[in-house]
Regions:
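Beta-rich ligand-binding surfaces for carbohydrates and other polyanions
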Residues: 2-269
Length: 269
């Protein structure tokens, strides 16, 4: 894990509001809004095998030689092939959903070449070791955005939930000091675990005495809290024309649903 090497680049990124989050070794999402970047020499890393989730280790590395390289389960699986095209190259995603590798200062050396309407987008190192761009955002929790614990964490936790997943009572997602939990009484709550009282930042205010609830995300991006096998306790009510979406617990404490999948290194179908 390396840190940004170029002061001019840092100033540039700050000038343009890009939040680099050095030390984000176990992160695996880049956002268009508020913007984040994978900076020169930085790497994303994803490994849930210690938590008995049987996918291989994945990493995405913005190499100092300007090549953006994806590794999965020990092998190189994809690259932008931009070696030697510039110095201080970094990866961002823009408000049209296009991923761009730029060299110092702003010259693009690689683009994903798929654009969509203006909105908020997320670039994910996915659970299966592939890359995916999702958006625009179709739903967001109503709490105020804020900055998470600035301390870097090297513990991988899962903070993305995909369509076709079903999760029972318990921890749903965790990002640093933020945790989304489906409680035993069927209330879906977003907590700040840094506070003694575990402040609730957002909740569905749902209740069921049956202790059998679960959450699902439909392919069209609608999030549900259900119980009694399939009865709906809560729904997000926003949908998009999509067959695959992602719910992300972002670094600013907001839950956001992005869909459809606009670009990927390997289609699911
Ligand atoms: C990862 O590599 C190991 C050892 O080479 C192999 O047994 C395993 O099936 C691979 N996992 C995936 C998801 O490809
Ligand atoms: C990079 O080069 C490899 C090997 O030539 C090729 O298979 C791959 O498609 C290229 N990547 C991109 C993004 O074009
Ligand atoms: C994107 O489009 C440019 C210009 O047409 C082309 O040179 C480049 O190879 C394309 N990139 C990908 C990843 O397809
Ligand atoms: C995380 O970082 C700390 C301090 O650098 C180190 O002691 C610990 O072993 C690391 N844990 C993992 C799982 O890498
Ligand atoms: C979704 O719509 C239902 C029915 O109109 C409404 O009762 C519920 O409050 C809405 N949910 C949200 C999260 O807005
Ligand atoms: C759903 O997946 C199929 C198969 O890849 C694809 O052709 C189609 O465009 C997708 N539909 C939507 C609405 O995204």
């Amino acid at each position: 894990m390396a840190f940004p090497t170029s002061v001019p680049l840092l100033i540039l990124l700050l000038t343009f509001g890009l939040l680099g989050r050095p030390g984000s070794a176990t992160d695996f999402v880049i956002y268009s809004d508020p913007p984040t970047a994978l900076l020169p020499g930085q790497m994303f890393h994803y490994d849930l095998t210690p938590q008995d989730i049987p996918y291989g280790r994945a990493s995405l590395v913005m190499k100092p030689d300007c090549n953006l390289v994806l590794y999965f389960n020990g092998s190189k699986t994809w690259a932008t092939n931009t070696t030697g095209l510039g110095d201080n190259c970094y990866l961002t995603i823009d408000s049209h959903g296009e991923a761009i590798v730029q060299r110092n200062i702003h010259y693009p050396v690689w683009r994903s070449n798929k654009t969509s309407v203006v909105g908020s987008y997320a670039f994910l190192l996915q659970w299966n070791g592939e890359l995916g761009i999702y958006g625009p955002a179709i739903w967001s929790s109503s709490n105020e955005g804020e900055l998470s614990d600035p301390k870097p964490s090297n513990i991988t936790t899962d903070y993305v939930f995909y369509s076709y997943s079903v999760l029972p009572i318990g921890k749903i997602l965790e990002y640093k000091n933020y945790r989304l939990v489906l409680r035993d009484d069927c209330n879906l709550v977003l907590l700040d675990t840094n506070t003694n009282t575990q402040d609730i930042k957002w909740q569905t205010n749902t209740y069921s005495p049956l202790h059998d609830c679960f959450i699902t995300l439909d392919p069209n991006g609608e999030l549900f809290v259900k119980h009694n096998r399939r009865d709906i306790l809560w729904r997000s009510n926003e949908t998009t024309n999509s067959n695959f979406s992602a719910l992300v617990l972002r670094y600013d404490a907001k839950l956001v649903i992005y869909g459809p999948q606009l670009w990927t290194t390997k289609p699911l179908w």
